[in-house]
Amino acid sequence: MHQVISATTNPAKIQAILQAFEEIFGEGSCHITPVAVESGVPEQPFGSEETRAGARNRVDNAQRLHPQADFWVAIEAGINDDATFSWVVIDNGVQRGEARSATLPLPAVILDRVRQGEALGPVMSHYTGIDEIGRKEGAIGVFTAGKLTRSSVYYQAVILALSPFHNAVYR
């Protein structure tokens, strides 16, 4: 059984990680241990590079806390231009897989507050009345009318980031 350290305690992110690992390696093939670690970037990262750095830092910090795991996984959400997205970083101590999620354009009223220094989650909670929306369906669920959720979009990115770990062409 794969021991997977999730560098987050966010249920939406953990669900995506578990589903993706089970899709690739088989149901019941992994045990997820969530840990809270620092990203080393602002609470609301801006730009692709800052967001990817946050995910990489989380993986590195999780490896230091739990060096005996098989995989370390981080998902860092950020804002780039007028949209939200995330970076997924997966490491197994030998190689690293990274993938960027789909991008969701955000309304100007939301972006204005985020650009003034507020994090997306609390701004979305204010407009929707959904407490801790970032730990649930997220802005993605709201603006796609539930057709996609934060977890479902992250799932795809985790699948992509796992590609180097089960395809011999990458080795």
Curated annotation (Swiss-Prot):
InterPro entries found in the cross-reference section: ITPase-like_fam, Non_canon_purine_NTPase, NTPase/PRRC1, YjjX_NTPase
Chain positions recorded as substrate binding sites: T8, T9, N10, P11, A12, K13
Keywords: Hydrolase, Magnesium, Manganese, Metal-binding, Nucleotide metabolism, Nucleotide-binding
GO molecular function, one term: nucleotide binding
Function: Phosphatase that hydrolyzes non-canonical purine nucleotides such as XTP and ITP to their respective diphosphate derivatives. Probably excludes non-canonical purines from DNA/RNA precursor pool, thus preventing their incorporation into DNA/RNA and avoiding chromosomal lesions.
Family to which this protein belongs: Belongs to the YjjX NTPase family.
Name of the protein in question: Inosine/xanthosine triphosphatase
Species of the source: Salmonella paratyphi C (strain RKS4594)
